């Protein structure tokens, strides 16, 4: 009940501002009042192996909550089994003009067109070095807006090279709808070229550092069955370590007539649940358990978390559900899956 009171106050603010203030508050140490309401519930130990790594539990943060790795320690206190930071790019960039995030409150949805706003990969590395979290940190990487699609692989390779020694796993974001033509990297020759080069770089760095860092590809929920089958074949062919399903959707049809429904950008939250879960089901069949799936999109309850896992996800992630239901949702999910 306490969180829903706080939520009413937060929802009076512009969404991006509310997000910033919430994380800043989380980052303040030694607040006994805050600890009582948010950290009190005991979380069961449920370790699981995925991508060759041991996760404390199946639930992690989705990319976007902590773009620059400034709140790793604070988020870890909430009980997450892993933290995924980013999306970060080789160089800092401001992203798209504000306002660029909008709530669809009646549907528990969020539309965003952030545009990979971040302080760059070097800043993220400094923040990871400063953190005390001993669990798994995934690093989600993307390309700079100024980098052409033809040269985009270079941006991913730069980020992989720099972050390799500091990441538990690396997530390749080629599915954000808010960077022009980025989703084209999911298709044909561009996709094959990307997979070949990042796998080659991974092998080089594995040999150099004697450390294997898994690589996951994050895909769109707006792909057809045929496209998902084709993607699955290439993921298997190039021995990619995992697939993250899914990013936000451009399909706003479920929001017809609602406030903010006409805003451009990717839709996340509850309206994405069915679409992302369906994508997981198709991937699960086409991947034949050769590559694990990390499920994300619309998880707002124990049941929706279970749906992702029953559809084939090994790990799951949340973001919008946390906005609408608060930190206690984390503990409920972990203790019941």
Swiss-Prot record:
Gene3D superfamilies: Aldolase class I. Keywords: Cell membrane, Flavoprotein, FMN, Membrane, Oxidoreductase, Pyrimidine biosynthesis. Substrate binds at residues 67, 112-116, 173, 178, 247-248. Its cofactor is FMN. One of its GO terms (cellular component) is plasma membrane. Its EC number is 1.3.5.2. One of its GO terms (molecular function) is dihydroorotate dehydrogenase (quinone) activity. It is found in: Cell membrane. The active site is at residue 176. InterPro entries: Aldolase_TIM (IPR013785), DHO_dehydrogenase (IPR050074), Dihydroorotate_DH_1_2 (IPR012135), Dihydroorotate_DH_2 (IPR005719), Dihydroorotate_DH_cat (IPR005720), Dihydroorotate_DH_CS (IPR001295). GO terms for biological process: 'de novo' pyrimidine nucleobase biosynthetic process; 'de novo' UMP biosynthetic process. It holds the Pfam family DHO_dh. Disulfide bonds: none annotated. Pathway: Pyrimidine metabolism; UMP biosynthesis via de novo pathway; orotate from (S)-dihydroorotate (quinone route): step 1/1. Coiled coil: none annotated. Belongs to the dihydroorotate dehydrogenase family. Type 2 subfamily. This is Dihydroorotate dehydrogenase (quinone). It comes from Buchnera aphidicola subsp. Acyrthosiphon pisum (strain APS) (Acyrthosiphon pisum symbiotic bacterium). The gene is pyrD.
């Amino acid at each position: 009940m306490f969180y829903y009171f706080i939520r009413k106050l937060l929802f009076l603010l512009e969404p991006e501002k509310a997000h910033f203030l919430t994380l800043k508050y989380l980052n303040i140490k030694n607040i006994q009042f805050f600890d009582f309401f948010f950290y009190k519930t005991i979380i069961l130990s449920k370790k699981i192996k995925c991508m060759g790594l041991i996760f404390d539990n199946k639930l992690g943060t989705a990319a976007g909550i902590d773009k620059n790795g400034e709140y790793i320690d604070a988020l870890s206190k909430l009980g997450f089994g892993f933290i995924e930071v980013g999306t970060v790019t080789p160089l800092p960039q401001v992203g798209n003009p504000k306002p660029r995030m909008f709530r669809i409150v009646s549907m528990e949805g969020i539309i965003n067109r952030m545009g990979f706003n971040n302080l760059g990969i070097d800043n993220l590395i400094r923040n990871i070095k400063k953190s005390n979290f001993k669990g798994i940190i995934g690093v989600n990487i993307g390309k700079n807006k100024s980098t052409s699609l033809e040269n985009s692989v270079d941006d991913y390779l730069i980020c992989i090279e720099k972050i390799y020694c500091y990441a538990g796993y690396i997530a390749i974001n080629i599915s954000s709808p808010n960077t022009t033509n980025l989703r084209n990297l999911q298709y044909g020759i561009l996709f094959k070229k990307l997979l070949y080069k990042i796998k080659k770089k991974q092998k080089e760095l594995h040999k150099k550092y004697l450390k294997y860092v898994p690589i996951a590809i994050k895909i769109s929920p707006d792909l057809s069955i045929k496209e998902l089958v084709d993607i699955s074949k290439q993921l298997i062919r190039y021995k990619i370590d995992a697939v993250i399903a899914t990013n936000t959707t451009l399909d706003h049809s479920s929001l017809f007539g609602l406030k903010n429904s006409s805003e451009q950008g990717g839709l996340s939250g509850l309206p994405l649940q069915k679409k992302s879960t369906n994508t997981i089901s198709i991937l699960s069949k086409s991947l034949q358990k050769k590559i694990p799936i990390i499920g994300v999109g619309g998880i707002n309850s124990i049941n929706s978390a279970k749906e992702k896992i029953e559809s084939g996800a090994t790990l799951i992630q949340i973001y919008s559900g946390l906005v609408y239901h608060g930190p206690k949702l984390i503990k409920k999910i972990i203790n019941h899956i």
